[in-house]
Amino acid sequence: MGPIRARTVVAGVALAVVASLGWTTPAGAVDAAARCAALAGVDIPARVIGLPTTGGEVTDAALVAPSGSGTSAIGEHCEVTAALHPVDPAAPDIRLQVALPTTWNQKALMFGGGGYNGTIPALDGNVPFGPSDAPRPLGRGYATFASDSGHQAPAGFLPTASLYGEFLANDEALRNFSGDALKKTRDAAVFVIDRYYDREEPEQTYFAGGSTGGREALAVAQRWERDFDGVISVYPAFNAATLDLYFGHMTRQLAAPGAFPRPAQQVLLYNAVITACDGLDGLTDGVISNEPACDFDPAVLRCPEGQDAGDACLSDPQITAIRAVSSAVTFPYPLASGETGYPGFPFLSGADMSTPLLGLGTTAPADPMPKTAGYGMQFWDAWVEYAVTRDPGFDSLSLDPLAPGPWEDRISELTALQDVNDTDLRPFAGRGGKLLLLHGTADELVSHRATVEYYEGMVQTMGQRKVDAFARFYLVPGANHANLAAAFAAGWDSLTALDRWVTTGAAPADPVVRDTNPGATRTRPLCEYPAHPRYDGTGSPDDAASFDCGTG
């Protein structure tokens, strides 16, 4: 849960005072420490949760003292930890936390997770692609909440807790991860909020998440349109099982003899792509703004005779693999979710294979899967072993996602469960819900091209006018997955924009995104898809005012 914060010691006498007053006492009439302590041990009835559980309880409640200053300031709040129990006694609990500000703005925000989840996101964190020059949600007075989606990664799991996938072997845990935990967490959190603030529910409730959390943001808009007033979905892995299949395709391509580009060769490729395409947008700034116009041919880096001759060139097997993982794949069998393929990654138009952890890694995929292999390859390995075959000893390299044989039906079944791809959001829009959808064009883990396909599917299903009435889609040139060592680390106050749209009806107008890399001062217009920033050729290249949005 991030840095350890000072906690106010709550005297037992305060707990007794609140217990004697009962739950009808106005929230402001009792000391915050006592009100907070009184939550400990409170039952969360199964009847208040919209999906099956066996109920739960608050396991801990402690008042957290104010901390930080300026935009990093976090006010006093009650931090509540709770557990929701499964129907299947073999399934793990859902563990969740809720932060309840003493000075509350009457609004709530749920954070999404990442990867396979397994930990609770920091309640004092920021929204994905959030601003560095504005307070975080909890610092603004939002009640914030999040969960581990129904399983707990072991402490110290390597290379990161978000790659722990053993829980997938349990059906209820799998359903929770696939979306059910979102509803259960939301209902339990609102129950706690209502209890703490004396029967007062939030006036607005929002959801913000990236990657798996971006999928979760779209899931709540698609499945529980009455529960959230607005969602921020960033680099969403919405078609999760289909993406897993593409990870499998990548894994097999890169495991071929001599196919894996070493880290120095990954950097070689990235630098060559930037050199070739950076100026296509009229400005040489390390960012490829006109990404669709870039189609780099890795053959220009070919080693003599196509043989591996060191890190200054690429062999024929490496060129073949790089082209394969940069290209679309169509699956030659039907998937129950309706997905038909995956569009590939922009490694030949600006994405960096060498991004730490999230890129291709430093070691070729193998069986058993190395902890130094790429994130997507380890993700595939866990999915095959625990969700598909449910055999921890299964060699994931032996399963061909283009010809899965006896596993075809199981894979199709998983796509129906995990792909969150309903493009008809009229129920959500019809009750006033708003959607902000963002993706970086240099994403090395979840392709922005897939998000483009989802958005275009929305337009095809609903019509452009209806989509424009409730949704905005922005592509951010140079931004990658989670702003990790990105050419352009995107920062935009999407929460203020979303809240204004929901509460006043004013849609985002001429938004500006800031590069939040250390020492960076540049800004760019945040252009609605399909436009991208275009430099005017005269103004400061660090000022968004020197750019317009266009498609040429």
Q: Could you tell me what each predicted segment is?
A:
Residues R199-S211:
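Alpha/beta-hydrolase fold nucleophile elbow
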Residues G209-A219:
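Glycine-rich nucleophile elbow surrounding the catalytic serine of serine-hydrolase chemistry
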Residues A219-A221, R226-T330, A490:
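A catalytic-pocket lid/entrance helix-loop region that shapes and gates access to the active site
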Residues L436-H439:
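Short beta-strand/loop motif that positions the catalytic acidic residue
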